């Protein structure tokens, strides 16, 4: 009996070490995914609340803000890693994982994607509920590292 207990404890410890190594590896490659809407709280510069993205297209569901290193029109695919993120994509984004880079942001730098939530998708309340998450991202079909 004692032998089995030692084996079980060893297997649990091994699983914990492997899970931690997996988590550290994936954490290294995750992007910060936040959300915003067109309200004065999210866009605090009045001239930028003109109903258009930075590329001058009208605001719409499916546009995201990304760093200047990612060109306008690039396809951004969210790759949820955890069950929590998978459920968030299903519940908040309606299962949508593909977005188009349409906007820039003053606080958007490397490894940061900001999803636009129009009023029809819940606006500011939905953006607040989304919060800040970390996920893997594919840009133009290439898994980013």
What residues fall within each predicted segment?
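Positively charged n-region of N-terminal signal peptides that target proteins for export
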Residues: 1-4
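Hydrophobic membrane-insertion alpha-helices, especially the h-region
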Residues: 6-19
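Solvent-exposed, well-ordered loop and adjacent helix/strand elements within mature globular domains
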Residues: 19-145
């Amino acid at each position: 009996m004692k032998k089995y207990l030692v084996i079980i404890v060893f297997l649990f410890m091994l699983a914990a070490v492997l899970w931690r190594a997996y988590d550290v590896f994936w954490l290294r490659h995750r992007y910060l995914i936040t959300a915003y809407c067109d309200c004065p709280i999210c866009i605090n510069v009045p001239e930028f609340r003109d109903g258009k993205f930075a590329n001058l297209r009208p605001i719409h569901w499916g546009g995201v803000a990304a760093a200047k290193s990612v060109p306008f029109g690039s396809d951004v695919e969210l790759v949820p890693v955890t069950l929590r993120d998978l459920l968030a994509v299903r519940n908040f984004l309606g299962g949508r994982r593909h977005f188009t880079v349409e906007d820039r942001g003053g606080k958007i730098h490397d490894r940061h994607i900001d999803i636009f939530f129009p009023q029809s998708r819940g606006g500011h309340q939905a953006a607040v509920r989304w919060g800040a998450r970390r996920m893997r991202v594919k840009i133009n079909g290439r898994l980013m590292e």
